[in-house]
């Protein structure tokens, strides 16, 4: 009985995603089944992404009526966050908005992108996109569409203060996989949980802090359990839009052009909005009583070097050639 029930559940999930999917035998519209790593109610990047899809949809309706439809299925409640790129690779979904750190099991070199100091269009000009396209084609059966979420940095947020770098030793802090090596070097005990569980972990003192970008704290509802933000920040949150490669290849040229140009516009829009967003959010932090802790200059310098060295050390062990090449490409000459 249990096996029958499990089979029904699996079949239901598959049918949920196959509903409205596009095959070569079907007529238009082509339906793009889409998921995101974060919910639209909690994450700034998801909200901006869905606004962008709406903009592209309107342009498609005007230029190519009846040819393209975006079907947003949801976030981690539909497919667990760290399984979404695997779902994309297999063709269960057609497009994902995700973070590079969520699929390093497939592509460990993607962590290098957290060290970029370029804008997405500078990366395109420098050959970064072309190299990422090659890697995603080969390793994830994916087409690299765009990089969103630029300009923000990760920070450590705490419920109790620190004064120097040694004070982090022994702390339990919620992190994403990318942050684990650095946190361990700081003496932190890293805890990995889904983003939706950070509030509960803080409220119940399972952790005394978490690592997140500035723009997402308030919308995730974390201000009530947050007292301190530590500077300097480290690593850019690398938010990407990927499409299943087989799906991409089947698209007619007019829709490929529409999507490519629309996503490039979205990159510029995101950069403009994130600067305003960060300024606004820092003001909201003050209103909520969140204090900023600036590490002493010597500690701050050590902190930044430890962060960069920890990340590159791991990447070069797992993917020496691609990791080194990617780092060279994102480093401004």
Question: Which functions belong to the PLM regions below?
Answer:
Residues 1-11:
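Bacterial N-terminal signal peptides that target proteins for export
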Residues 9, 20-21, 251:
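Prokaryotic Sec-type signal peptides and long signal-anchor helices
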Residues 12-13, 43:
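Alpha-helical transmembrane segments and their juxtamembrane interfaces
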Residues 15-25:
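C-terminal segment of classical bacterial N-terminal signal peptides
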Residues 27-118, 122, 137-138, 142-333:
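N-terminal secretory/targeting leader peptides
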Residues 125-138:
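Signature of the catalytic double-stranded beta-helix
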